[in-house]
């Protein structure tokens, strides 16, 4: 199908995403989106702890299974190892068909390419990809579509329910045992955690690390 700038969009892409082709800069002016309702978990017993010892235990407690969507942020840029650590454990557990919904992926995440090749990761939704991940996508190694959005477009997709995040991993520099997070006060201060705000609000489960006293 031909879009508003004359580009032919494959029908299989339209069918897979349920999207319309680009109809012009102002085609959605005054359009109303309905927000999805996030899942909220209650904690009434002050003696019950949400703490776990490691990534494996966190994944088990979050109910990891085939076909889930896992989200990450990129505030640590090329110093981020959260994606690699989590995906290594998911791979070791034998989980397949994972979609990664990240605010961005860079060269620091090159180690996850083998998981694309073996089917651990089958979909990527991000605001950008670089390095060997980009090469893997460009050469057809990713089974499903790679969907790129602006940072604001990613927020809209999550808030509207177009993307449902099952588990969000947020590598905040500091957090407490209640899950309150901030971007300073630790060993990897990174500034405002704005990219991960929508993940924290809408994901079914949220995992954080770098504990400090409440």
Language-model regions, residue ranges each:
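Conserved alpha/beta enzyme-core scaffold
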Residues: 1-214
């Amino acid at each position: 199908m031909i879009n508003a700038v004359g580009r032919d969009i494959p029908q299989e892409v339209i069918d897979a995403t349920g999207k319309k082709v680009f109809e012009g800069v102002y085609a959605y002016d005054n359009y109303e989106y309905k927000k999805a309702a996030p899942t909220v978990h209650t904690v009434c017993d002050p003696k019950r702890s949400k703490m776990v010892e490691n990534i494996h235990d966190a994944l088990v407690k979050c109910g990891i299974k085939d076909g889930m969507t896992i989200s990450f942020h990129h505030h640590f840029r090329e110093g981020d190892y959260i994606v690699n650590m989590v995906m290594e454990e998911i791979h070791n557990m034998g989980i397949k068909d994972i979609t990664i919904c990240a605010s961005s992926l860079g060269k620091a995440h090159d180690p996850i390419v083998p998981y694309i090749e073996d089917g651990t990761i089958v979909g990527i939704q991000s605001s950008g990809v670089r390095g060997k991940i980009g090469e893997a996508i460009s050469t057809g190694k990713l089974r499903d579509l790679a969907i790129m959005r602006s940072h604001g477009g990613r927020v809209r997709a999550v808030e509207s329910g177009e993307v449902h995040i099952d588990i969000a991993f947020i590598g905040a520099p500091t957090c407490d045992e209640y899950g309150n997070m901030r971007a300073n006060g630790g060993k990897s201060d990174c500034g405002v955690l704005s990219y991960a705000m929508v993940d924290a609000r809408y994901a079914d489960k949220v995992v954080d690390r770098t504990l400090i006293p409440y």
